Amino acid sequence: MKIISLNLNGIRSATNKGVQAWLKTQDADIVCMQEIKAQQADMTDEMLNPQGYYGNFHYAEKKGYSGVGIYSKAKPDKVIEGLGNSILGHAHTSVADIDSEGRYLECQFNNTSVGNLSVISLYLPSGSSGEERQTFKFSVMERFLPHLQALVASGREVIICGDWNIAHQEIDLKNYKGNKKNSGFLPEERAWLTGLFNQVGWVDVYRSLHPETTDECYTWWSNRGQAWAKNVGWRIDYQIATPAMAAKAATASIYKQERFSDHAPLIINYRYD
């Protein structure tokens, strides 16, 4: 089972840069997309439902902003747009505030060869624009944690694909020394991810296959300066899975031969009958 995760930085822009044509060559079973930056009315039939796929989306209320989507060859048994009432916790940010930004889409596939499977497209907020958005990001992380705990305990196999906007370790970004006080590499953000892996029980699938890879692991490059040309990148896009599902991962790669956005596609193949 081949799963691709990609922050499109705008589905219309990425389509103009050839992403739909590229996807046809990939024959992926599931494609998780983030930062759609469009509403349904803005999208062509090819964007909504590429040939051979079912398309599902969770749009942001604000036009041209955020939004996530999933293409799947198999029709999902259930589609969950947003976190709704599944989130607990006592953070100041309301669930409605989070869901209005179109950041969570879950497709459930039941009675598969691995049991009941959920694939989620996730777009965690960035806090790089200022203190207000960083506060929102921390609040979303606090709100999201009980849901992540519940998913692990649900008995389903789960793969969460997306832009987490956090580089976990020093090997996950080029300039780690200069970014220790910057959003995306703050100690609190990194500790939160560590907790997901070490305490909650999630597995960083790429890292399970490539535990020491550095320069080749990056998935995002700033548009400023010559970040792409000099490979001054960050690994902030992940496929995070329940342990049994992660154990089925066979290969993981990052596609950089073409550029469809400021992110690169993360491609993972799972052993799946």
Question: Model features per residue range: what roles?
Answer:
Residues 84-96, 124-141, 177-182:
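Surface-exposed cleft-lining segments at the edges of enzyme active sites
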